[in-house]
Curated annotation (Swiss-Prot):
Involved in transport of phospholipids. There is a cross-link at residue 605 (Glycyl lysine isopeptide (Lys-Gly) (interchain with G-Cter in ubiquitin)). This is Probable phospholipid-transporting ATPase 4. Its EC number is 7.6.2.1. Signal peptide: none annotated. One of its GO terms (biological process) is phospholipid transport. It is found in: Membrane. SUPFAM superfamilies: Calcium ATPase, transduction domain A (SSF81653), Calcium ATPase, transmembrane domain M (SSF81665), HAD-like (SSF56784), Metal cation-transporting ATPase, ATP-binding domain N (SSF81660). The chain crosses the membrane at residues 75-96, 101-123, 306-327, 360-377, 923-942, 957-976, 1007-1029, 1043-1065, 1072-1092, 1110-1134. InterPro entries: ATPase_P-typ_cyto_dom_N, ATPase_P-typ_P_site, ATPase_P-typ_TM_dom_sf, ATPase_P-typ_transduc_dom_A_sf, HAD-like_sf, HAD_sf, P-type_ATPase_IV, P-type_ATPase_N. Mg(2+) binds at residues 867, 871. Its main location: membrane.
Length: 1216
């Protein structure tokens, strides 16, 4: 294959840093010792047939995220269904109903159970089918695989085997964990994006072994064979130990040769690799856990309620069986007319114990209506409908990507309303991975007039808040005017948007910088931007402009900015970079060559990057950019001329949420450079464990006596609405933790951008402190970390300022120790006391462990949100997992419970849908238990009234229809349509969310209250009916009512009472609820009428009962009215007194809206909105509150000074 054009572009190994330099195989580097447990994997390269039999047969590349398969669906799903207490009880009841002891027809017990369980299993099947189809899509992706004939043909991912040679092309994802053999570049270099693994968008450089570089075309693979001996599958993303046996030599392998599944090939036309790990053996899948079957807290509490009712059921059944035994022993001899012709043990007075035991089974079945069999299926239906509302909410539809919100499981809808802590990924979740060059400081002058997103949003919020507080006098400019000024600032001049460049300032554009003072410094600033990097230019033939593939988006934005300023980096060779420089107003450019002598790369430890170049005049320059704290401490005495104003500008940029770097340079003479370069070359070609440390020490020798030129300010573009969303969630009382694989500096900058951090907030950084030159032992490190945590806890507790806010920042290495058993709860205690928590450089496994710690340590509901494969473990570990369905992969979405297109939609998902779903489900369940207790206990009272005979007062069909038809639809409507307040009010009053977080509507106080209401209703329904009807003339002819007439009258009262009760419960009526509530009552009368018209062989004692017996009797209608009113009167009185004496927040809002006070009295409405904010220390609101306190402090100080001055002025005549 022709490779000349690609080879001529770059020989990267000559210009890359010591981190990219590769010792030759003959330089004596020893292979890794591969032996012992954990190092048993053997891979035969290009010989996949060797892996078809054990022990070399490894897992296939098929990946599954489903909970069930064809074999396990029925047993596993049935287990899940009968794991529920109520379903298990009704399974036992259905089995017992087959025997003659049952007081009901067997189908009246079996049919509802089959319907309920079948519907739930169908829902589970449909949801798992959705996961299966997404798996099919991923597994059906194709990649080129080498065949024995030397050709590469496309094959599905799932059919790839260990040992296969695959070819991955540019912008393709790696289908498995591969060993890089060669790339389209002759140096075997390729760029990889690992955002799906560690969240970082910075491109990583991978490089093959020198010995495999010749494998560069199809023919070269015909006879290629080799053996890889390496570590077993493990979750560590950043380590790999192995050896390659090739051409009778052994070559050591390290992570720089490994291409991980779900990472993406960038800036490289193609690579060849051999498959080492497949499917669930890959590191990304090792970092994920099996998709768990999650249950909400409310559902778990519901089980305890059912256990309580089961205890009540067993108690009254024992009372009933004891009563029956008593009646059998002492009264059965007198009741000769009840004895059967053939004696039975059941009625034998000489054996009452046996009679009582047998009757116990009858009683357990008879009183089973205390347990609501339709509760689970009704909740399933309601949750599915709630989920459909989430899916169809246009306010959570992203028009740009065309992606709506999606509830991938409906089991956790109500959990959305009870979240305490949100654990969020950063890259791709909070940010859009887009850096814009926005401002800069050069030679002590700040340039760039556009405002950052943070400044604009904060100014708008401050304008609103200051207006509400009435803080600004009419003589000064209004906050709204100030906000308008900032908005105008942010959109000065309409121009074609340029990716990576949001700068606007006429002083530097179009060559105007030549008129500025300090032109030499400005020229140096631009040259540092254009030269100090490792990027590769690519010409866009359509636009004629260059784009840049860089290791970091910051670097790409610097080059774009330099290009817009007139310094276009357009070419790189193995030893030089070329820049077109515009040095005049005419627009003409000069091509200049800068020879790259050395490049000292950026690392998280160094926090800086330098390049040593020789310009065309022969001058040697060290150009350096890095963190301001690092650069400032390396400045020469004469290099601090601009230190003061630059520091001031950096603070301003930081307050604006911008990422900053300081730029500096140093001139080197030939002699000094030559001496240093000899040492540097010696260090970078050395082989040993201390190589990196040696290189750092030698780099420090040259990176000193720097001269400060200026600083850059780059905006890490947040996703649209992120700061506002975080602010609203904070007002709702939610805590937010950020878990990211990024560097600490990057994470801190994002924290400022989205107002998780702010100026004045005290930062607690927990890090591992190593001794110079030597690593500490594990115990010393643990003691050090524990000491840091203990001191931080004391500092937080001793803080007396109520407005003080703390932010905890910890890196992944330190977190490894902090999550160990002896320390994790101290760490958690510190973290929960901090306003915000940021964990940096964390692995996917650590994300999951932190989530587990918060979930189990606090006992509160956690929500994890992320967009990449590196977030899967965290998403699955949390009580609720939310996936961002971005452009990079679907792993997070596939593992999630809910998916949204943008982070900002989380606000509506929680504050609106979460609040509604929690309240709906809570009220629905409480009502369900109320109506079943009210109904079920009447059976017990009738039993006691009739000598515990085991006879039901209600017809079998009444019992069958009560839960399934006559009372199910109104309660489903309650669970689907109920709204205490509208969605707009939920967003305006975010503190309403605290009702769910505090579980106000499903605590035991409220549950027992509803159960007590059910007991009261049952007493009224039975005894008031008996009092009205018993021994009274029921018909005109003077006849009394029989059992069926009494039972039908009582059942009518129950239908009326429970439906009127639900009508009083509803806050938001729709026509559907009216139809279902009053229609259920009408349906009852229709059923009784039609059922009574059937032949007596079918209707039995119900024959024409409504038409001929009940309807003509006035006492029937009087009893219905009196019983219904008496039943609901206490609840009506309760809700009335509560609204008058102890109203809840939503009661006040409902009243304000009903009387339209929000329109007539805006000041009261604003005051109520302000009160409805949860006191928070993060977000725009906290930032604005801090600003208001600052303004008040300044005003009070000014008034105090004026008062003192006035006092001195009045006293001065006396002193004369």
């Amino acid at each position: 294959m022709a490779r000349g054009r690609i080879r001529s572009k770059l020989r990267l190994s000559h210009i890359y840093t010591f981190g990219c330099l590769r010792p030759s195989a003959d330089e004596g580097q020893d292979p890794h010792p591969i032996q012992g447990p954990g190092f048993s994997r053997t891979v035969y390269c290009n010989q996949p047939h060797m892996h078809k039999k054990k022990p070399l047969k490894y897992r296939s590349n098929y990946v599954s995220t489903t909970r069930y398969n064809l074999i396990t669906f029925f047993p596993k799903c049935l287990y899940e269904q009968f794991h529920r207490a109520a379903n298990f009880y009704f399974l036992v009841a259905a089995i017992l109903s087959v025997f003659p002891l049952s007081p009901f027809n067997k189908w009246s017990m079996i049919a509802p159970l089959v319907f309920v369980v079948g519907l739930s299993m169908l829902k589970e099947a449909l949801e798992d089918w959705s996961r299966f189809m997404q798996d099919v899509k991923i597994n059906a992706s194709k990649v080129y695989v080498h065949k024995s004939d030397g050709e590469f043909r496309r094959r599905k991912w799932k059919k790839i085997s260990v040992g296969d040679i695959v070819k991955v092309e540019k912008d393709g994802f790696f289908p498995a964990d591969l060993l890089l053999l060669s790339s389209s570049y002759e140096d075997g270099i390729c760029y990889v994006e690992t955002m799906n693994l560690d969240g970082e968008t910075n491109l990583k450089v991978k490089r093959s072994l020198e010995v495999t570089l010749s494998l560069d075309d199809y023919d070269s693979f015909k006879d290629f064979t080799g053996i890889i001996r390496c570590e077993d599958p493990n979750p560590s993303l950043y380590t790999f130990v192995g050896n390659l046996e090739y051409e009778r030599q052994i070559f050591p392998l390290d992570p720089s040769q490994i291409l991980l599944r779900d990472s993406k090939l960038r800036n490289t036309p193609y690579v060849y690799g051999v498959v080492v790990f497949t499917g669930h053996d890959t590191k990304v899948m090792q970092n994920s856990t099996k998709s768990p079957s999650k249950r909400s807290r409310i559902e778990k509490t519901m089980d305890y309620i059912i256990y309580t009712l089961l205890v009540l059921l067993i108690l009254i059944s024992c009372i009933s069986s004891s009563g029956f035994a008593w009646e059998t022993k002492f009264h059965m001899p007198k009741w000769w007319y009840l004895r059967p012709e053939e004696p039975e043990n059941l009625t034998n007075p000489s054996n009452p114990v046996y009679a009582g035991f047998v009757h116990l089974i009858t009683a357990l079945l008879l009183y089973g209506y205390l347990i609501p069999i339709s509760l689970y299926v009704s909740i399933e239906v309601v949750k599915v409908l709630q989920a459909s509302f989430i899916n169809k909410d246009l306010h959570m539809y992203d028009s740009e990507s065309g992606v709506p919100a999606h509830a991938r499981t409906s089991n956790l809808n109500e959990e959305l309303g009870q979240v305490d802590t949100i654990l969020s990924d950063k890259t791709g979740t909070l940010t859009c991975n887009q850096m814009d060059f926005l401002k800069c400081s050069i030679a002590g002058t700040s340039y760039g007039v556009r405002s950052s997103e943070v400044e604009v949003a904060a100014a708008q919020q401050m304008a609103v808040d200051l207006d509400e507080h009435g803080e600004v006098s009419s003589r000064t400019s209004t906050p709204r005017a100030q906000a308008r000024d900032i908005e105008v600032e942010s959109s000065i001049t309409p121009r074609i948007p340029i990716k990576g460049f949001g700068f606007e300032d006429i002083r530097l554009m179009d060559g105007n910088w030549l008129r500025e003072p300090h032109t030499d410094d400005i020229l140096l600033f631009f040259r540092i931007l254009a030269i100090c990097h490792t990027a590769i230019p690519e010409l866009n033939e359509e636009t004629g402009k260059y784009t840049y593939e860089a290791e970091s988006p910051d670097e790409a934005s610097f080059l774009t900015a330099a290009s817009e300023f007139g310094f276009v980096f357009f070419k790189r060779t193995q030893s030089s970079v070329y820049v077109h420089e515009r040095l005049s107003h005419s627009g003409q450019t000069i091509e200049r060559e800068y020879k790259v002598l050395n490049l000292l790369d950026f690392t998280s430890k160094r926090k800086r990057m330098s390049v040593v170049v020789r310009d065309e005049e022969g001058q040697i320059l060290l150009l350096c950019k890095g963190a301001d704290s690092i650069i400032f401490e390396r400045l020469a005495k004469n290099g601090k001329v601009y230190l003061g104003p630059t520091t001031k500008h950096l603070n301003e940029y930081g307050e604006a949420g911008l990422r900053t770097l300081a730029l500096s340079y140093r001139k080197l003479d030939e002699e000094e450079y030559s001496a240093w370069n000899a040492e540097f070359h010696k260090a970078k070609t050395s082989i040993g464990s201390d190589r990196d440390e040696l290189l750092e020490r030698i780099s420090d020798m040259i990176e000193k006596d720097l001269i400060l030129v200026g600083a850059t300010a780059v905006e890490d573009k947040l996703q649209k609405g992120v700061p506002q969303c975080i602010d609203k969630l904070a007002q709702a009382g939610l805590k937010l933790w950020v878990l990211t694989g990024d560097k600490m500096e990057t994470a801190i900058n994002i924290g400022y951008s989205c107002s998780l951090l702010r100026q004045g907030m005290k930062q607690i950084c927990i890090t591992v402190v190593n001794s110079e030159g030597a690593s500490q032992d594990a115990k010393a490190v643990k003691d050090n970390i524990l000491n840091q945590i203990t001191k931080a806890v004391q500092m937080v507790k001793l803080e007396k300022d109520p407005h003080a806010a703390f932010a905890l920042i910890i890196d992944g290495k330190t977190l490894t120790y902090a999550l160990e058993d002896e320390m994790k709860y101290q760490f958690l205690a510190l973290a929960v006391d901090c306003a915000s928590v940021i964990c940096c450089r964390v692995s996917p496994k650590q994300k999951a462990l932190v989530t587990r710690l918060v979930k189990e340590g606090t006992g509160k509901i956690t929500l994890a949100i992320g967009d990449g494969a590196n977030d899967v473990g965290m998403i699955q570990e949390a009580d609720i997992g939310v996936g961002i369905s971005g452009v990079e992969g679907m792993q997070a979405v596939m593992a999630s419970d809910f998916s949204i297109a943008q982070f900002r939609f989380l606000e509506r998902l929680l504050v609106v849908h979460g609040h509604w779903c929690y309240k709906r489900i809570a009220q629905m369940i409480c009502y369900f238990f109320y109506k079943n207790i009210a109904f079920g206990l009447t059976l017990f009272y009738f039993e006691a009234f009739t000598g515990f005979s085991g006879q039901s007062v209600y017809n079998d069909y009444y019992l069958l229809l009560f839960n399934v038809v006559l009372t199910s639809l109104p309660v489903i409507a309650l669970g689907v349509f109920e709204q205490d307040v509208s969605s707009e009010i939920c967003l305006q009053f975010p503190a309403l969310y605290q009702q769910g977080k505090k579980n106000l509507f499903f605590d035991w106080y409220r549950i027992l209250g509803w159960m007590g209401n059910g007991v009261y209703s049952s007493l009224v329904i039975f005894f008031l009916n008996i009092g009205i009807i018993y021994e009274q003339a029921f018909r005109v002819s003077g006849q009394t009512a029989d059992m069926d007439a009494v039972g039908t009258t009582m059942f009518t009262c129950i239908i009326w009472a429970v439906n009127v009760q639900i009508a009083l419960t509803v806050s938001h009526f729709t026509w559907i609820q009216h139809v279902l509530i009053w229609g259920s009552i009408g349906l009852w009368y229709l059923f009784v009428a039609l059922y009574g018209m059937m032949p007596p062989s079918l209707s039995g004692n119900i024959y024409r009962i409504l038409v001929e017996i009940l309807a003509p009797a006035p006492i029937y209608w009087i009893a219905t009215f009196l019983v219904t009113v008496t039943t609901v009167l206490p609840y009506f009185a309760h809700i009335s007194f509560q609204r008058f004496l102890h109203p809840l927040d939503h009661h006040i809002i409902q009243e304000i809206k009903y009387y339209k006070r929000d329109v007539e009295d805006r000041r009261m409405w604003t005051r109520e909105r302000t009160k409805a904010r949860e006191k928070t220390k993060i977000g725009f609101t906290a930032r604005v509150d801090a600003k208001i306190r600052h303004l008040r402090s300044k005003l009070n100080k000014k008034q105090s000074n004026m008062s003192q001055f006035s006092t001195q002025d009045t006293m001065s005549p006396r002193s004369v």
